[in-house]
Curated annotation (Swiss-Prot):
The gene is rpmB. NCBIfam families: L28 (TIGR00009). GO terms for molecular function: structural constituent of ribosome. This is Large ribosomal subunit protein bL28. InterPro entries: Ribosomal_bL28, Ribosomal_bL28/bL31-like_sf, Ribosomal_bL28_bact-type, Ribosomal_bL28_sf. One of its GO terms (cellular component) is ribonucleoprotein complex. Keywords: Ribonucleoprotein, Ribosomal protein. Belongs to the bacterial ribosomal protein bL28 family. Gene3D superfamilies: Ribosomal protein L28/L24. It comes from the Bacteria. PANTHER family: 39S RIBOSOMAL PROTEIN L28, MITOCHONDRIAL, LARGE RIBOSOMAL SUBUNIT PROTEIN BL28M. GO terms for biological process: translation. The keyword Ribonucleoprotein applies.
Amino acid sequence: MARHCELTGKKANNAFSISHSHRRTKRLQHANLQWKRIWWEEGKRWVKLRLSTKAIKTLEKKGLASMAKEAGINLNQY
């Protein structure tokens, strides 16, 4: 499974690790992803999604149905 948020699409960012001598090597800054079980009111069941912590905070404000509609996700597949 790809390491990205299923609602917002957040994924890893390319960055550099910089040593004391200022040598730079490429690395990835991964999104803070969590498995979250959310109650889907319209479907009357639990839905398990891999979400970024920012998406979890936004869910509390907007709700699951509206965020899934914005992302173009069919919740029946989860």
